[in-house]
Amino acid sequence: MAMELTERERIIRTYRHQDVDRIPMLDSAWKGTKKRWVLEGMPKGVSWEDYFDFDHLIRVQPDNSPRYEARILEEKERYRIRTTKWGSTEKVFYELDSTPETLSFYYDTPEKWEEAKQRMLTDYEDRIPWDYLKENYPKWEAEGRFKQLTVWFGFDVAHSRLTGTENMLVALLDEPEWAMDIFDTYLKTSLALCQKILDAGYKFDGIFWYDDMGYKGTPFFSAQTYRELLQPFHKKAVDWAHERGMVAELHSCGFIEPLLPDIVETGVDMLNPLEVKAGMDPQKLKTLYGDKIGFHGGINAQLWDDIDKVKAEMERIIPIMKEGGGYIFASDHSIPNSVSLENMREIATLAHKLGKY
C-alpha cells in the first residue's frame, strides 16, 4: 500500500483485515527495561515508542473497584505490605519489575462479596480520570492515535485481585452463581463508567480487557466451563463495543488454545499476547482462525536477549502472520529488562522491514 497511514487508521484497518502500509507495532516495556535503555544511550524525555518508531498504546481505565481502604501496613528494607482497593493484602518489593506477592483476600466468600458488590455499585465522580482525559485527549486526536477503553472484568481480575485463585476455581464448580454474579457486577460497573466517558463526548476506537485464562500447557478450566460461565460476559462486552462502532481486543495469557473456537464465536476482533512460552503456536492459530480473528504478539520474549535467535523467529513468524492482514507485531507478553538497547534497535528495524506490505 503506497499511502502512509496514521496510527489510528493503520490499527483499525488491521483489526478489520484490510490493506495497510505496514503491520502495526504495539508493545509494552518493563520499567527496568526502559531504565536500562536510557543508561545505554536512549535520550531521557523521549518515549521508547518514538525512539524505536513503534505505534502508541493509548488506554483509559475507569475505576470500578470496591474502594477498600488502601494503606501501608508494614515497611521493610526490601518491601512493604499494603492493602489494595480490591481488598487484597500484598507484599510489594522495591526492586524494579518485581511482581507483588498476594498474602490474603478480604472478599473471599459469597457473604463478603455482597459487601464488595454494593461498594462497586456506589458511584463516585473520581472513578473516571477526567483530568487525565481533558489534558491528553486533544493531543491524541491531533496525533491520530488509536484509543482503547480498558474494561475491567472476567476470571483473571476477579481471582487475582478479589477472591483468590483457589476460591474462584472452586466457585466455578460448586458455586457458579457466585462466580457469575462477580463477572456480571464487574462488567456492568465497568461498562457503565465507560459509557459515561463516551457520553461526555470522548470518542474511542476500541475496548481492551485482561482475562488470563491459561497457564503453561493448559487452561485454568474446561471449554465447557468457559462456555457456560464466562463466555456470556465476554460476548456482552464485545457486543457493547460493536454496537458503538468500536473493535474489541482480549488479552489472555497462558495456553488457551482449547478455548479458541468459543473465543472466536464471541466476535472478539483481536487476541493478545499468544504466549509461546506457555505453549501457544501463533502459526497454527493463524492457519485455523486467521480469517476470523486478528492476532497481536506471538514473538517469544525469552529470545529477545539473543539477537540471532529472535531475528530468526521473527523471519519465521511475521511473513505468515501478516498474510491477509490482521496481525500486530509484539512480544508474547512484554519486553523484559534482559533486552539491550542495541538488540531493541535491531528488532525494531527488522520488524519494520518484515512488516511492510
What residues fall within each predicted segment?
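Short, solvent-exposed loop/edge-beta patches enriched in aromatic
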Residues: 19, 53-56, 74-76, 142
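Surface-exposed flexible segments
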Residues: 38-46, 93, 97-99, 343
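Active-site loop segments of alpha/beta catalytic cores
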Residues: 1-35, 40, 81-83, 112-357
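Segments that shape or occlude catalytic/ligand-binding pockets
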Residues: 36-71
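Short linear motifs in intrinsically disordered/low-complexity regions
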Residues: 22, 28, 51-56, 64, ...
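A contiguous, low-structure linker/loop signature
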Residues: 69-122, 143-146
